[in-house]
Design a protein with these regions (language model features):
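Active-site neighborhoods of divalent-metal-dependent phosphate/nucleic-acid chemistry enzymes
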Residues: 61-108
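Short, hinge-like loop/turn segments at secondary-structure boundaries
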Residues: 40-44, 80-81, 122-125
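Acidic, PIN/NYN-like endoribonuclease modules and their adjacent C-terminal/linker elements
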Residues: 95, 99-133
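Residue-level signal for well-ordered alpha-helical positions
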Residues: 15-16, 36-40, 76, 83, ...
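Conserved beta-strand scaffold positions in the cores of enzyme catalytic domains, especially
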Residues: 22-23, 62, 122
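Residues at the C-termini of beta-strands that transition into short coil/loop
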Residues: 7, 27-29, 66, 109, ...
């Protein structure tokens, strides 16, 4: 299983995914996406972000932050802190969910997950051909 970080979910259609792989999304990312809807400053932004969130709701059963994930959080966050790395809360929580499920994390911000790479595989998405920033 691979957990998709929020930044991958935002532009989900821009990336290629392996049909043989299981992909998941964290309830923490859903919270960030919901914040994006609520913080939008125009009706167009609200509509676009709401549509994206509805599409993702239809595609994913959001992984909960359960008791086992909190145990993993203690492990990954303490391990990162012991190396002197700055522990970013949301990223550590998503890394903990990945650790708990034996999953990797796919993100555009690999550096944000480097402190947890000793316990969680960190991947970057492959862009679809013809799509450029």
């Amino acid at each position: 299983m691979i957990i998709l970080d929020t930044n991958v979910l935002i532009d989900f259609d821009r990336y290629l995914f392996d049909a043989g792989e299981a992909y998941a999304a964290s309830i923490l990312s859903r919270a960030e996406l919901e914040f994006g809807v609520q913080a939008a400053t125009s009706p167009e932004q609200i509509a676009k972000r709401t549509q994206r969130l509805n599409q993702l709701d239809a595609r994913f059963d959001w992984l909960p932050m359960d008791k086992e994930s909190t145990r993993s959080y203690g492990l990954v966050a303490a391990g990162a802190k012991a190396t002197g790395a700055k522990v970013r809360g949301k990223d550590a929580l998503i890394a903990a969910q990945a650790h708990r499920h034996g999953a990797g994390v796919m993100t555009l911000n690999v550096d944000d997950f480097k402190p947890f790479a000793h316990l969680v595989t960190v991947l970057t998405p492959t862009p679809r051909l013809g799509i450029v920033d």
